[in-house]
Amino acid sequence: MTIHIFLCFLLILKIVNALKSNRFSSYIYTPKTFLYNNKSIPNKKLVRKFVNRIKLVDDTIKSNEHIIKITDNATNKIKELQKECNDDYLILKLYVENGGCKGLKYKLNPIKKNEIEEDDYIQQFDELKFILSIDSTSVIYIYNNTLDYSNDLISGGFKFINPNATKKCGCGKSFNV
């Protein structure tokens, strides 16, 4: 009986800690070394290092860098889509939603200029006449990704290469951070 009570207590403690976590932060697991006071210290265990992703994104915006990079294959496909588009710029809305095998999946949909929300992060590619409108709540999952395109018959289309993902689904459509 005491074991059951103890296990219930541990479960409640885990739930409370999960509810306290901040959705705007993540942890990086470093298996070999970590930095402490700018010194590299060897580590035999996994160490948690707090990373403020919103600050990274805000610094990126201030330095005029792109939140997401685009490969040559994706650039060529965007040029094709731009030719089919009736507007001056091709505008795609990028966001992350719950779903897929690993918990999160990307959504990329064409939108009109008046559908861009005020709090979206805008990434403009003038040479391609292309605007990427990134949902403000999704930007923490999209930061530092690479957009690629594949003509494969199976699982072809736009794909995201996410260096921040800790788990990926076999088909490559969903991920977890």
Swiss-Prot record:
It is found in: Plastid, Apicoplast. GO terms for cellular component: apicoplast; cytoplasm. Keywords: 4Fe-4S, Apicoplast, Iron, Iron-sulfur, Metal-binding, Plastid, Signal. [4Fe-4S] cluster binds at C101, C169, C171. Its main location: plastid. Belongs to the HesB/IscA family. Homodimer. Homotetramer formation is observed in vitro. NCBIfam families: iron-sulfur cluster assembly accessory protein. This is Iron-sulfur cluster assembly protein SufA. It comes from Plasmodium falciparum (isolate 3D7).
